[in-house]
Amino acid sequence: MNRRDFLKWSPSKSDGAASLLSGSSDLTPYVPRPDKPWNARRAAHLLRRTGFGPQWAELESAMKSTPAAIVDVLLDNSGAQPMMFQNWTTDDPFDDSTEPEVRQQFYTTWLRDLQFWWINMMLVPGPTRLREKMVLFWHGHFVSEFTKVEVTQYMYIQNRLFREYAFGSFKELARKISTDPAMVIYLDGAGNKAESPNENYARELMELFTLGTGTYKDGTPHYSENDIVELARALTGWTPKG
């Protein structure tokens, strides 16, 4: 079952979520019919699950469309990336022309700019709602935080990466996040040197971001300590600048 089929699926019982909660194995895509009409209740359910709560105009528009057509629009990430029109997004974060204290004040102001911009992106009505929900999801999965990164430009770059791969290849996203400037700082990649490897990111990548702890059916562990060591060695030398 692919993502598109999943989003088209609808519970088989009239209460909307009952069959899902009861563990029903019926994954047949929802198709409107007389006993299960496409109505305001089902349209609102779809829009809530794929966004942050629909506006009335969105609900009215959805009711005039079909579930399949709405899902096609929601999964279309072919449009241009939204840009944050602030000069600081392309400034050198390590520009020494200003005093460190002044530069830190800039970072604080820029962080507020970034937060407001991102929240506004989530609130924009229309087909980008699901993409923005996925950006939030990936930020919670490949977690980092400004309190350690301290460079607003890098948080902005990471936010754009999650948006680019909102519906893309998980493998490629994992590859990209491994050298993402914010992640390199957050999980100590900048201190990962050939002469003294730092295994923090390698361990997090395998344990939390991808494979997880446990074993396969044949008893083989998902990864070994040696895998962590070798991955850490493979990622030595990366800095926030590349």
Where are these regions (language model features)?
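Primarily short, surface-exposed interaction patches in extracytoplasmic proteins
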Residues: 54-72, 106-242
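N-terminal module-boundary/linker segments of secreted carbohydrate-active enzymes
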Residues: 5-113, 122-124, 129, 222, ...
